[in-house]
Swiss-Prot record:
The record's note on its domains: Consists of three domains: the N-terminal catalytic domain, the editing domain and the C-terminal anticodon-binding domain.
A single GO molecular function term of this UniProt record: proline-tRNA ligase activity
UniProt subunit comment: Homodimer.
HAMAP family per UniProt: Pro_tRNA_synth_type1
Gene that produces this protein: proS
Protein's organism: Dechloromonas aromatica (strain RCB)
Name of the molecule in the record: Proline--tRNA ligase
Length: 576
């Protein structure tokens, strides 16, 4: 490709409303153009990157035995009503009526459609297992689309669905997809982690997320370098302290703490470390039968509540945070001074994190404005609480596998695999006849990759002050040739054209910058758009038979013999 024949424009500055690095870089580099909030046009340069990601995903899925199909973006409401998700989904499900007043949705996902396809045609265990996937545009009407292609309303996704006659066979395919996803992200050239994850609203049992590591990532990943253990912080178990609870060494006392409501302020006022403070989080659970449970969740002052873990406490599932009025009604004061001491156990349930259950001589709210209790001990000053793991792990915690300490990494979720089991198959009556002729519900797996999201995540991982740094496998071009004086020097033009032809002949994805621009402009553009390898051809070097080579991450260029440049580039690209 020659730049004179290519349609791309670059910007010196990113638009003011661009929020994250990838969004800024993609707009500046001309990868995308904003059409509306959360909706983008993929320009030729960005589309080259997107298609390279898509092709790697497709190759590996095909190699793994999955079959590609293409389902409709527009789905009939009847399928969503049959599965129960018509009511469960919120406003992010874009619904509309056609001219005949029939209801449809723009698909944010395709569990209903694929299950309908399979239930129509698969009747016998002899037709199972089957794994079908597509790469298709989806739409979710996000309330606040942000971060460019990272959280847009329209996005390109690979979603695959497998159907099985047994759970054991589902687990086999799940392992196959785990390995396939690992190969995909390795081929893409990305630093990533596969982590155990919560299944969330999609349901099912086992689940793993695949995260591209980046400091700007939205998700926290707990990782043990000694063992390779990895899990989303939402799921990682916080182990109970090994040491026994220390004996009480002081009496409980009510202490005046005027205006000190936050744990950090209380700790500073009392001149105590934050891990000596117990914070009480008031929650309310309302059951379908109309019963209510008001509860205090106790955590150490330096720990954060893990809502997913807390929601697994049966007595308060589901729960919401209590209102100020509800707190005052049951505890007699506003949040900030509430605690588990001297409460009516018939009105207030208490659940403590493992770390709190191990504390002695701690500080908590006194249920009186402006006061906290100090020197509090379980068993003496208040009953022993029910104990659960309800906090997020932190760096330095023991790894749940017992083989080291946890580190916390930041990641961007780009893939997710689920063992759905029978949730959708049962709702949509997706059944088969087993070898005895008995009707059985199929087991399902679900496997998603955010294809367009990968592009944004790769840029979040690879960038500097000059622009985008992409792995060669997904860069818009592998090599750029920048001739100095292409339109003025016949020698430069001839050498550039010859190198361009030689590289194209051996299959290198190369771009020749034949614009009549200043060298500084060409250098800046090629660095901004993220081309891994650059060859500069000038009259001075040609006199000595030399080209200038520089990789995107090199600090300084090196001079390479004109006769060696193709071999050098081949070696660099093969090693990538």
């Amino acid at each position: 490709m020659r730049t004179s024949q290519f349609f791309f424009t670059t910007l010196k500055e990113a638009p003011a409303d661009a929020e994250v690095i990838s969004q800024k870089m993609m707009l500046r580099a001309g990868y995308i153009k904003r059409a509306a909030a959360g909706i983008y046009t993929w320009m030729p340069l960005g589309l080259r990157v997107l298609r390279k990601v898509e092709n790697i995903v497709r190759e590996e899925m095909n190699n793994a035995g999955a079959l590609e199909l293409l389902m409709p973006a527009v789905q009939p409401a009847e399928l969503w009503q049959e599965s129960g998700r018509w009511e469960q989904y919120g406003p992010e499900l874009l619904r509309f009526k056609d001219r005949h007043q029939r209801e449809f949705v723009i698909g944010p996902t395709h569990e209903e459609v694929i299950t309908d396809v399979v239930r129509r045609d698969v009747k016998s265990y002899r037709q199972l297992p089957i794994h079908l996937y597509q790469i298709q545009t989806k739409f979710r009407d996000e309330i606040r689309p942000r971060f460019g292609v990272m959280r847009g309303r329209e996005f390109l996704m690979k979603d695959g669905y497998s159907f099985h006659a047994s759970f054991d066979d589902l687990k086999r395919e799940y392992g196959n997809m785990y390995d396939t996803y690992s190969r995909i992200f390795s081929r893409l050239g990305l630093k990533f982690r596969a982590v155990a994850a919560d299944t969330g609203s999609i349901g099912g049992t086992g689940s793993h997320e695949f995260h591209v590591l980046a400091d700007s990532g939205e998700d926290d990943i707990a990782f043990c370098p000694d063992s390779g253990y990895a899990a989303n912080v939402e799921l990682a178990e916080a182990m109970a302290p090994n040491e026994a609870r220390a004996a009480a060494s002081t009496l409980m006392e009510k202490t005046h703490t005027p205006g000190k409501m936050a744990c950090a302020d209380v700790a500073k006022f009392l001149e105590l470390p934050l891990d000596r403070i117990v914070k009480s989080i008031a929650v309310m659970s309302e059951k379908e039968d109309g019963s209510q449970t008001f509860a205090l969740l106790l955590l150490r002052g330096d720990h954060e509540l893990n809502e997913i873990k807390a929601s697994k406490i049966a007595a308060i599932n589901p729960f919401r945070f209590a209102t100020e009025e509800e707190v005052i009604e049951r505890l007699g004061c506003k949040p900030g001074f509430i605690g588990p001491v001297a409460i009516d156990a018939t009105k207030v349930a208490v659940f403590a994190d493992r770390s709190v259950a191990n504390m002695s001589d701690f500080v908590c709210g006194a249920n009186e404005a402006g006061y906290h209790m100090t020197g509090v001990n379980f068993g003496r000053d208040l009953p022993e609480p029910e104990v659960f793991d309800i906090r997020n792990v932190v760096a330095g915690d023991a790894s749940p596998d017992g083989q080291g300490k946890l580190e916390i990494l930041r990641g961007i979720e780009v893939g997710h695999i689920f063992q759905l089991r029978q949730k959708y198959a049962e709702a949509l009556n997706c059944v088969y006849l087993d070898d005895s002729g008995k009707s059985q519900i199929m087991e399902m797996g679900c496997y998603g990759i955010g294809v367009s999201r990968i592009v944004g995540a790769a840029i979040e991982q690879g960038n500097d002050d000059k622009g985008i740094i992409l792995p060669p496998a997904i860069a818009p071009f592998e090599v750029c040739i920048v001739p100095m004086g292409y339109h003025k020097s016949e020698a430069v033009k001839a050498s550039a054209d010859q190198l361009y032809a030689d590289l194209k002949k051996i299959g290198v994805d190369v771009v020749l910058d034949d614009r009549n621009e200043r060298p500084g402009v060409m250098f800046a553009d090629m660095e901004l758009i993220g081309i891994p390898h650059r060859v500069v051809i000038g009259e001075r070097g040609l006199k000595d038979g030399l080209f200038e080579y520089k990789s995107r991450i090199d600090a300084e260029p090196t001079m390479v013999a004109q006769t060696d440049i193709v071999t050098l580039l081949q070696g660099k690209l093969c090693a990538a």
